[in-house]
Amino acid sequence: HVAAMASDIHADIRWTVRALRDDPTQIRLFPVVHGIVERFERNSNLPVNVRLPAVEPTLAFDTLRHLGYIVEEALVNVWKHADCRTAWVAIETQNEQLHVVIGDDGVGFDPAEVAEWPVGSKGWGLENIRERAQQVGGQCHIESAPGEGTRVVIQIPLRDQPDDARRNQAMWEEVWRLFGF
């Protein structure tokens, strides 16, 4: 468990540094998703279809960071386990909710079977995805069956997202916390 926590902390630092390469006040959902997908496609040679809403929602830095990791972790799971031809990331806003689906047309699995694994034995990726969704007030559920692919479904409330000024302040507080400025 300690190794997984250390890995998460290291990943948080890497993500924050990557995000700060550009103007940190301009960090937005669409470029983050496209960047993750482009890196994934380059490293995996697996095509990923991306569907985004017409209007880009403004998200708190913490929500954006966790959502970036969720998409990244779900795609890594696709690459490791799905044995698929294609994957997708679909994002839409509806009824003050951000809906994110990361899916594939792969081999699938029985989610009930995964839920029965002892803590720490396997499934850290799915557990991390669930925890990150909960940390930003969201929910996660997995839709899968053997032979039918997998869908990781995330719902995050939009009503609690701060405006840009508070979002930027929260981002800098996170940087100061991570790097001790």
Language model features with spans:
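Coiled-coil dimerization/phosphotransfer module
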Residues: H1-F181
